[in-house]
């Protein structure tokens, strides 16, 4: 049966990105952080590119982080409602089969999806769908792609159902 939670998955990904990028930036050296903050202050307010959104999240205030965290909790409640009717949700693991590791700087990395170069952060879309809401997910390998790299399916369960998702994958 086709089933979808009651929220826009792209919106969920945006919230995931805000929270993830702000958390990751906490480890940024002070000088780099100050330089990035100055750069962000000079961004065009209408610039909603992935790079601009990432940079804004990296220098967000605690107030902005807390607002995004509140949105996360609203998403969590929508997941709670979803799992009142479904035991688990099956999703892809990534938008592509596994790919070779890219050692370039994170911002320079890209993914090929249907012969189109895409933003590397899109690769964590499916992981973020469960991760932003603290939901357990287990990856079940399902085979190998044409290049010999693995393909899998993600099993997402309700909060605290780790053993359910692991059991289904087992």
Located regions from the model:
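Short helix-loop capping/hinge segments that flank enzyme active sites or metal/cofactor-binding pockets
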Residues: 19-80, 96, 101-103, 141-149
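Short, basic, helix/turn surface patches
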Residues: 23-40, 118-124, 160-170
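Short, surface-exposed loop/helix-turn segments at secondary-structure junctions
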Residues: 99-123
